[in-house]
Amino acid sequence: MKDEVNTALELIEGGKADDTTAIIAELASRGQWEVVYLLSVTAGRELSVLFDAENTVHVDWGGPGLVPLHPPLGISIPFRLWVHTHPHGYAYWSQTDRQSIAQGTMILEQAQVLGGNGILSTTRLEHPSSLGRLADSGPLARWTKEQVLPWEEWQLRKQSNSCEAITEVSV
């Protein structure tokens, strides 16, 4: 993993975005969100990772403070997961994030934002709920309101899940 990070950092510094997006897509496919976030911080730009219905990964670079949900042509819906970064701050749902999630309610299943404090997730509910939602009414009433999962806790869960998978395979 260290080699992948160093290679990605060299590509970012060299301005070779196409090569960088391929590396980020691979890291995202492996669930290595901490590395994806560090690359975004190093580049000083937000980035967006979108998993489509066929589990194809699409990566899009934004600016220092904005990367809206912007699916490329030919992508398969529904979108399984949209992950984007806030490289200069915390994981929270900005107004742009909320607008993107609201607009994607019918075609997006889950969204996450990566920030310095951890990972914030939301999952679309089949029906609006009165418990823990992003808004009281409208499209955001169909999205769960969750707490930020600190990076340390995320790492522990990831390690725990890896150990469980190894145990299941070896039994």
Predicted regions and their residues:
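Conserved beta-strand-loop surface patch within small alpha/beta domains used
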Residues: 1-81, 88-171
